[in-house]
């Protein structure tokens, strides 16, 4: 019986929050500027992250191969798959960028 009371109280609280949210005027605040990073900077950071992931995976695999204690095969495989997926995603981004560049270059002026 107490669960029903708690549920009803929860529903009443949710409805009151909904009414409060609907009653308040909505204003759109401009997004705070966080240093204006360029697309090239963001792409460079993504490439560095992929590189770091691959290096960490390689180091973990080497540690497992030499029999270092505390390194499990599952950890090695998960790290390897993370590196593989991140590299594949980066490759797809590169392919899309190349395709977009080619499309722009083929546009009539």
UniProtKB/Swiss-Prot annotation:
One of its GO terms (biological process) is bacterial-type flagellum-dependent cell motility. InterPro entries: FliE. Pfam families: FliE. Disulfide bonds: none annotated. One of its GO terms (cellular component) is bacterial-type flagellum basal body. Belongs to the FliE family. This is Flagellar hook-basal body complex protein FliE. It comes from Pseudomonas fluorescens (strain SBW25). The lineage of its organism: Bacteria, Pseudomonadati, Pseudomonadota, Gammaproteobacteria, Pseudomonadales.
């Amino acid at each position: 019986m107490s669960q029903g009371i708690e549920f009803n109280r929860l529903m009443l609280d949710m409805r009151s929050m909904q009414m409060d949210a609907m009653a308040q005027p909505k204003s759109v605040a401009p997004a705070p500027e966080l240093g204006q990073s360029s697309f090239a900077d963001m792409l460079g950071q993504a490439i560095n992250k992929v590189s770091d992931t691959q290096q960490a995976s390689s180091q973990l695999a080497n540690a497992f191969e030499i029999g270092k204690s505390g390194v499990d095969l599952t950890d090695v495989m998960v790290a390897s798959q993370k590196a593989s997926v991140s590299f594949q995603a980066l490759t797809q981004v590169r392919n899309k960028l190349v395709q977009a560049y080619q499309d722009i270059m083929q546009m009539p002026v």
